[in-house]
Amino acid sequence: MREYLDSKSQKKVALLEKIFYAENHTSTQEELLNDLNITYPTLISTIKTINFDIERFGYKAFSIVHSAPNLSYTLKISDNCSIQLIINAYIRESPKFQILETLLLASFPNLQALSKKVHVSYSGIKKEIKELNEELRERNLSISTGNQVEITGDEFSLRIFYAFLFLVTYSGDRWPFSFVQYDEITDLLESCPKEIYRANSIDKGMMIHYYVAMHLLRDRMNCQIDTTRQFKVALYKACTEESKKSESAFIKKVAKQLPNRNYKEITYTTQIILSTIVAFGSYSSIEKMPSFFYMDEQLEEMGFMKLVDFASERVNDNLSIPFSEKEMELLRYSFASINYRYFLLDNLINRFNNIVPGYTDLDRNIRKIHKVNHLEPLISQLVNLKEMRLLKPFEERLASDYLIILDKRIDFSIHTLPIKVTILSTISNETAVFDFMRYFSSYYNLEIINQVDPVVDLYISDFSVSPEVLTSLRINQPIVYVNTRWLESDYVKINDNLAKIARKKFIANKKD
């Protein structure tokens, strides 16, 4: 959503982030001038404006402080505040966001009326709407300026788009819906069939609350999803007696929120809410595949679960140590959820990394790079198989989405062969072993060998070992030399060596 920022706000955010991501949240004046390509007067005025904005936003826990002796600037930030709050506040004040939020709730007779409402010039409004429409067209939406100024297009697409827009820009900072409170949505979700969602779970909870609130808002505005709308997949319906009872209770609670709708309309809109909840699935609180996936006749006709089972078995076949029954069920559930999301939402959230920056950047963690490097070829091979042709329309997203699933479902400390490590120390290796395991054990299957042994894959030592000693001890494996008290650079060296060894522990030697 950062593309909604105007040029002035973009420069402010760039300066903020430059200081924030610097060591100790401190940047020198020279770094800021050179890296941001600005003059000294511009730097001073921008910082002054940012500090004023931060106070105006109500985030007094933030401020940029100038250190004259060091010619540097430091971002003072308390533990209960986040830089994302400031960025979101700038987005909410941007003309593009103001236009979108205003048009969600009302239409206008002409551009002049909208211009007056959002305090943007007439020429500015035309420019902003033109740029917004370039993005909205991808979602089957547009801002019409014909007989009146309004947002038009597919109503289901609109609800998804606005739910994420509000989720990202308002987040947990404030609740933007005045007609219903957050805890009222929670109460409604308590009646949701437990096989698809549990209201007491925090996993994706805020996202679901925002979507349900947006869905109810549009229904209350008499903006209904056309009952003739074609979806590429069957809408959710309860298949077991327990789920049918929950579904009925859920419908009754939705009816209380929409008192002017008849039973048929309530049933249809509820079905879409539940289907969307299913599509956002792979919830941590759900440990078993929802019965809907394997009992619905339409899903069976399209070969939905055959696709899920094929992908799951293919992944399992490529692990050195296979999944347990429970782990396999969770993988199948994740694949079913993401595939259902593809068919239901189509291309509505095609650029998810633009919506939530960094969400797909798994390799930011250097200890995960080897895992990503192992999984990417597997996924590339999988998604190009003829058995996966049903997902061909979504191939651009498959690689990154499936990588997230496999990263979550495959524990490399369990499903790869062990890497045997010996840690040598001048005095005692006990502390080093503890630090080593604490830092790496979630990313590699590690086994400590407390002796010199041919089975050892890697030696780590805080003292040098001569070639003569290596020969006499018959040590042919690599040795990583580290400081007595390990530094960050030591961990990086160790990780690089573990990653090289891990390549042999994943797929290639599984059946050797």
Protein language model regions, located:
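A cross-family "folded-core" feature that marks the main globular domain of proteins
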Residues: 1-512
